[in-house]
Amino acid sequence: MFIQWGRRFFALFWLLISVILFSSYAYAEQGDKEAGKKIYEVRCLWCHGATGEGNGFAAQFTNVRPRDFTMGVFKFKRSLPGQIAADEDLFRTISNGLPGTPMPSWKLVLSDKEIWNVIEYIKSFTDIFESDKASGMVDYKGEIPYSADSVNKGREAFKKAKCYECHGENGRGNGMKKLRDDWDNREWPRNLAKPWTFRGGNDVKDIFTRVTVGIPGTQMPSFASANGLTEKERWDVANYVRSLVDETKRPVSPQTVLRAKYIKATLPNDVNAAEWNETPSAAFKLFPQLIENDKLRGFRPTNDSVTARVLFNEKEIAFLIEWDDRTKSVPGDPIVEKLSEGEVFEDAIAIQLRVGPPTAVQQPYPGHGDKTLGVEMWYWGTGNTSGGQTIKMIDANGLGTEKRRDAGRINIKGTGEYKAGIWKVILRRSLTTSNTHDDFQFERDVLIPVTFANWDGSNGEKASQHTLTNMHWLQLEP
């Protein structure tokens, strides 16, 4: 009897310890508002503003507007649909941050107690927490394990709920709807192929939560209503969404070298040729180009990465550059003009190479080079409805010094295709040219500095207002 009781005691004891140590759920604590105010004024005021209206000085430069606390509406929560956010929801957001936004993770800077103090102060910006309280949380007991069967059922439920109208048939966010949130900010549907950009978490439970609760203040509704999806269907949709991940779009570390593959055959002209599938790829994160005066204000890039593959033979080199883009931006196209906030420019991509000996390892400034180290850029654009695709060759020694050269004279060729929310563009040229002074000469087994620049024309991007990668290394196989 004593032995049985002892076993039960220790089993319960270790169960309790496991819950305490490994649970990701934070239980609410009563914070100190005055202590939270002091932290807020040092850490949070610059974006969220002195009165919590999301209008701090830095807000004008952010790609996603800071939360307006005075409305009491919080996007990412586990409290039930129609209920206000629970304190635990605010704790989770402050602790983990929101990927793809200026909201950082604070858990390595602030203690749990300090975060609870900040929450208590944030809640004082509205009286909604005085009269209301979350009374229930999303229940995960009915979770359906990930399987091919669940994914297939989720695909059908995705269609049933018409998720494709915003997220697109393949989940790339290219549903061609013009969306605005409750603060009248332009919103773009989430690209479901990039779960690392999901702001409220990206495991199956997190996705189930978003489908169940929705995202308050946005066009993303709750599908838990009577005419929405059943609990089982929502779990299947969550598994289906998780299956859409495209790992070739996940940005690599800055130290990653882009490897160019050698083939004896003629280089492919088709962006979907089988040779590209057998070529190493690397995805690079895009950053806003720093531009002068007040142009940076309100510039909120929509494309966040490019993926590159490179093939070469004895005579030529070819780059296949791929990126997800919610719109095919062609000036003069009435469909994309309805989606845009202003004038539509061409979608475009450019490769930037340093001018000079291939064996030199100095890196020029990623944005159009600098006075010391010049660059050449191979530019491809969509053109407009009355003309063909644009191909340019540009030399530069810094912003404002660009000089265009005839791309045809050095035999730069390009072609592009847009399909299901994805651009694929090939740019190619001979490995060497007769103009060794002005043209970059490719050599094998050396590190070559390379940068990629991207323009989303429906987002008002043109000239120096665009995104670009950091400088990375390209190496042709020895």
What is the predicted role of each segment?
Residues 11-22:
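Bacterial N-terminal signal peptides
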Residues 25-39, 129-159, 248-254:
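Electrostatic cytochrome c docking/interface patches
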Residues 30-49, 146-172, 179-184, 237:
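Sequence/structural segment immediately N-terminal to covalent heme-attachment motifs in c-type
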Residues 61-107, 112-122, 179-242, 346, ...:
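Extracytoplasmic electron-transfer domains, predominantly the class I c-type cytochrome c fold
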Residues 257-289, 334-419, 462-465, 470-477:
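Extracellular/luminal beta-rich ligand-recognition
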Residues 271, 316-323, 423-429:
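Short, well-ordered beta-strand segments enriched in hydrophobic/aromatic residues
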Residues 306, 315-318, 324-331, 358, ...:
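Primarily extracytoplasmic ectodomains and periplasmic/lumenal surface modules that are beta-strand-rich
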Residues 428, 436-478:
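Long, compositionally biased interface segments
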